[in-house]
């Protein structure tokens, strides 16, 4: 059990048979009446966001999440197959379960997989990955004086905005949180 006074961004709680993650919270102490905690909660399974108010000191069950480091071994049809490196147990995930991580995951890449009651909630990639550019327009010298960007397709099929000097075959570092270009990988 966790008190509503202890809510922080990222705290996971169980409500109505689902796991909810605290996205925002605000402790409110009105001049009259008792204090309360106003929260914005995101459902870990469906992604829906709701606002909910708790009395100060109200206790709710804290979700017990298990984080396992797993390796993406291969893709079978539409399913992404992950293997637990300790138990060699395989888990198959759909693109819906993977979310936006499908844009940046390669075979043999390790990721943290969050489980709740043996149900996969989320796949967490490292904050940056190195990907090879497979398609982009050639940059022409003198295109711009201030430095511009152009779209590039990387080996996973995702589109990343890159500087004009990046060409096909180069390896680039990409932020997995927002898909932005971080730099060249030498």
UniProtKB/Swiss-Prot annotation:
Note the superkingdom of the native organism.
Bacteria
- Localization in the cell: Cytoplasm
Which keywords does this chain's UniProt record carry? Cytoplasm, Elongation factor, Protein biosynthesis
Please give the Pfam families that the UniProt record associates with this protein.
Answer: EFP, EFP_N, Elong-fact-P_C
- GO annotation, cellular component aspect: cytoplasm
Q: Name one GO biological process term.
A: peptide biosynthetic process
Segment forming the signal sequence? none
Q: Which pathway is recorded for this entry?
A: Protein biosynthesis; polypeptide chain elongation
Which InterPro entries does the entry mention?
Elong-fact-P_C, NA-bd_OB-fold, Rib_uL2_dom2, Transl_elong_fac_P/YeiP, Transl_elong_KOW-like, Transl_elong_P/YeiP_cen, Transl_elong_P/YeiP_CS, Transl_elongation_fac_P
Q: Which CDD domains match?
A: S1_EF-P_repeat_1 (cd04470), S1_EF-P_repeat_2 (cd05794)
Would the keyword Cytoplasm be found if you checked this record's keyword annotation?
Answer: yes
User: What SUPFAM superfamilies is this protein classified in?
Assistant: Nucleic acid-binding proteins (SSF50249), Translation proteins SH3-like domain (SSF50104)
Q: Name one GO molecular function term.
A: translation elongation factor activity
PANTHER family, alphabetized: ELONGATION FACTOR P, ELONGATION FACTOR P (EF-P) FAMILY PROTEIN
Family according to the record: Belongs to the elongation factor P family.
Q: What role does this protein play?
A: Involved in peptide bond synthesis. Stimulates efficient translation and peptide-bond synthesis on native or reconstituted 70S ribosomes in vitro. Probably functions indirectly by altering the affinity of the ribosome for aminoacyl-tRNA, thus increasing their reactivity as acceptors for peptidyl transferase.
By what name is this protein known? Elongation factor P
Q: What is the lineage of its organism?
A: Bacteria, Bacillati, Cyanobacteriota, Cyanophyceae, Oscillatoriophycideae
